[in-house]
């Protein structure tokens, strides 16, 4: 009998080794350590390959929580044996306080010696509807190959095996054993297993015979008869089916000889109990093909020693910064290692984008976050605005991007050419940073037109007119302080308007300002309307800050009537009065209007 038991367990271990071989990992061999590669997770060329932890009895040495144990208080129990047709009973005492007479749960998972069996034992005659449960926590997720129990008593008439995948919070059935499946568990007897239900528990009457009275075995193989077992790598259903963090065995109904209700039923009932010498859970630490062993972490929790740039207790996610493709379980063909994002050494964080991954032909989906060293882009592969590439350094260099340093006055913007570093210069300005006037231009005092053409002096004759001044100081006197506005100045000009400068454009020898005329306080023969209008000022006047004017500012403009280049705008020149607007002036200008109507401008 004992020989048959050990032959059955040996067969299960052989199945486990075969499954390990199919998955590409080591089996149970006394020479495995000698034949193994130096790094089981990489091949001889250093390329990643699938690796799995050794096959173990995950129950060995672990605590088992049981709902019933004999010996508290001490109680009699009887062992039944048969001699021919004669049934014999030898009675003993179970006493939890006496180590020689105790049958604690620790005997379930200790070293199983067939020559010196140690048995856990329940209280006597806990018959249906009462049950007895054994609950084993594996400490982490395992991929379970089999669950086996060797009995010191007759095997149960009805028994169920459950598993938990969330550390005992919820339970799902793994397997049922009963001679009355429908009555006990509301399950059909030996229902066929198909691809549609291969993740469901079945009920069978195998292993439920009362005999042998001692030494019987119940062994459940998780993949036996499952249609997708031969293609386990590509079956997420079965991968989920064999995964467990906890195992629970529920003994539901005792096998009896039917004598428990006879006159001497007390002796008979003391002969019916559950006793188990060995509980085994054969399997491997679940690491999804990305680790060759499990280790204890700082919290003494069992975790996978992850490789292939993976992380997590089961190597079930990519470690930080390795999100260039989605996490996948390793297979015999592909290690499916996690790949680092390509950020050219300029970022420490990245994220995965499925749309980009699909567009790349499922090659790359990483997006870099918070690019440093003045870089930008999905891969931190170009320079951000205001910087350009230093082609003398590789893109991975921390100084691969140089500041444009565009001149605040000479440049038309802060962004330069990404390759050459050339800033966009205003008219008449040159240099890579727009920091000097071009040939034929001279510096002015205007931030709008910092460089103006050098005037060409006309030929001198006796009848020639006075020459144009050579510099701004002799041409006009720019305002250096606050300008004052009074009735006399108001009366001397043809128009007085409040304007808002919107934008400025160069037009030949003129600057054309688009302005919004907010209020009209005086106008000459040409009618001035409120709204958007063109204001024309000669380039020389702007260059010499006569008048001094800036975009996006509001001004009070007093000028003389003059035909504009477009015949519809107004003209200002070096003689015009341009003062930055103050709201307090509106009332004073209305008074000037009233005085003008009364003819006081003629006196002024």
Curated annotation (Swiss-Prot):
- Tissue specificity of this protein: In the embryo, widely expressed in the developing nervous system and in mesodermal tissues.
Swiss-Prot/TrEMBL GO biological process terms: anterior/posterior axon guidance; apoptotic process; axon guidance; axonogenesis; Cdc42 protein signal transduction; cell population proliferation; cell-cell adhesion; chemorepulsion of axon
Q: Which gene name belongs to this protein?
A: Ntn1
- The segment(s) forming the Laminin EGF-like domain are 285-340, 341-403, 404-453
Described by its record, this protein's role is as follows: Netrins control guidance of CNS commissural axons and peripheral motor axons. Its association with either DCC or some UNC5 receptors will lead to axon attraction or repulsion, respectively. Binding to UNC5C might cause dissociation of UNC5C from polymerized TUBB3 in microtubules and thereby lead to increased microtubule dynamics and axon repulsion. Involved in dorsal root ganglion axon projection towards the spinal cord. It also serves as a survival factor via its association with its receptors which prevent the initiation of apoptosis.
Could you name the Gene Ontology cellular component terms for this entry? actin cytoskeleton; basement membrane; cell periphery; collagen-containing extracellular matrix; cytoplasm; cytosol; extracellular region; glutamatergic synapse
Q: How does it assemble?
A: Binds to its receptors; DCC, UNC5A, UNC5B, UNC5C and probably UNC5D. Binds to its receptor; DSCAM. Interacts with APP.
InterPro entries attached to this UniProt entry: Galactose-bd-like_sf, Laminin/Netrin_ECM, Laminin_N, LE_dom, LMN_ATRN_NET-like_EGF, Netrin_domain, Netrin_module_non-TIMP, TIMP-like_OB-fold
Domain Laminin N-terminal span(s) in chain numbering: 47-284
Q: Domain NTR spans what residues?
A: 472-601
Which sites does the entry annotate for glycosylation? 95, 116, 131, 417
What cystine linkages occur within this chain? 119-152, 285-294, 287-304, 306-315, 318-338, 341-350, 343-368, 371-380, 383-401, 404-416, 406-423, 425-434, 437-451, 472-544, 491-601
Q: Where in the cell is it found?
A: Secreted; Cytoplasm
CDD domains found in the cross-reference section = EGF_Lam, NTR_netrin-1_like
**Key word Cell inner membrane present in the record?**
no
Its protein name is: Netrin-1
């Amino acid at each position: 009998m004992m020989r048959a038991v050990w032959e059955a367990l040996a067969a299960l271990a052989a199945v486990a080794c075969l499954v390990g071989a199919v998955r590409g990992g080591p089996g149970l061999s006394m020479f495995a350590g000698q034949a193994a590669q130096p790094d089981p997770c990489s091949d001889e060329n250093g390329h990643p390959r699938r690796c799995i932890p050794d096959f173990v009895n995950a129950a060995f040495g672990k605590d088992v929580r049981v709902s019933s144990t004999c010996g508290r208080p001490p109680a009699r129990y009887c062992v039944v044996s048969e001699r021919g047709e004669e049934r014999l009973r030898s009675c003993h005492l179970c006493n939890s306080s006496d180590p020689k007479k105790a049958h604690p749960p620790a005997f379930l998972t200790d070293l199983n010696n067939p020559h010196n069996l140690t048995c856990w034992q329940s209280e006597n005659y806990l018959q249906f509807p009462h049950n007895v449960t054994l609950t084993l926590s594996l400490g982490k997720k395992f991929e379970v190959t089999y669950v086996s129990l060797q009995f010191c008593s007759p095997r149960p008439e009805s028994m169920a095996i459950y598993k938990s995948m969330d550390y005992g919070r919820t339970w799902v059935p793994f397997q049922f054993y009963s001679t009355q499946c429908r009555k006990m568990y509301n399950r059909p007897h030996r229902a066929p297993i198909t691809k549609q239900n291969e993740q469901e528990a079945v009920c069978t009457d195998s292993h439920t015979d009362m005999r042998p009275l001692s030494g019987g075995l119940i062994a459940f193989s998780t993949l036996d008869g499952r249609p997708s077992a031969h293609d386990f790598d590509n079956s997420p259903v079965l991968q989920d089916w064999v995964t467990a963090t906890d195992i629970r065995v529920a003994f539901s109904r005792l096998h009896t000889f039917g004598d428990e209700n006879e006159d001497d039923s007390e002796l008979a009932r003391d002969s019916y109990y559950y006793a188990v010498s060995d509980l085994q859970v054969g399997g491997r630490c679940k690491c999804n093909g990305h680790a060759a062993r499990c280790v204890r972490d700082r919290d003494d929790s069992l975790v996978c020693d992850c490789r292939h740039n993976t992380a997590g207790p089961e190597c079930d996610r990519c470690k930080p910064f390795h999100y260039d493709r989605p996490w996948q379980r390793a297979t015999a063909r592909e290690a499916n290692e996690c790949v680092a994002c390509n950020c050219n050494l300029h970022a420490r964080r990245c994220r995965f984008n499925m749309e980009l991954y699909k567009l790349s032909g499922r090659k790359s989906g990483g997006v870099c976050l918070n690019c440093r060293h003045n870089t930008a882009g999905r891969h931190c592969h170009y320079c951000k605005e205001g910087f350009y590439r230093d082609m003398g350094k590789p893109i991975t260099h921390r100084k691969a991007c140089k500041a444009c340093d565009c001149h605040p006055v000479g440049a038309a913007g802060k962004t330069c050419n990404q390759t050459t570093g050339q800033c966009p210069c205003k008219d008449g300005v040159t240099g890579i940073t727009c920091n000097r006037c071009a040939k034929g231009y001279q510096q002015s005092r205007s931030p709008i037109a910092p460089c103006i053409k050098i005037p060409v002096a006309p030929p001198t004759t006796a009848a020639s007119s006075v020459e144009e001044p050579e510099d701004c100081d002799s041409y006009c006197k720019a305002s250096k302080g606050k300008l004052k506005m009074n009735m006399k100045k108001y009366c001397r000009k043809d128009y007085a308007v409040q304007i808002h400068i919107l934008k400025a454009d160069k037009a030949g020898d003129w600057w054309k300002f688009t302005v919004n005329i907010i209020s009209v306080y005086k106008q000459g023969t040409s009618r001035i309307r409120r709204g958007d209008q063109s204001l024309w000022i000669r380039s020389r006047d702007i260059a010499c800050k006569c008048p001094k004017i800036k975009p996006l500012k509001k001004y009070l403009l007093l000028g003389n009537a003059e035909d504009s280049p477009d015949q519809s705008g107004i003209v200002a020149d070096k003689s015009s009065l341009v003062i930055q607007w103050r709201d307090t002036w509106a009332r004073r200008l209305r008074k000037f209007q009233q005085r003008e109507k009364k003819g006081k401008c003629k006196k002024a």
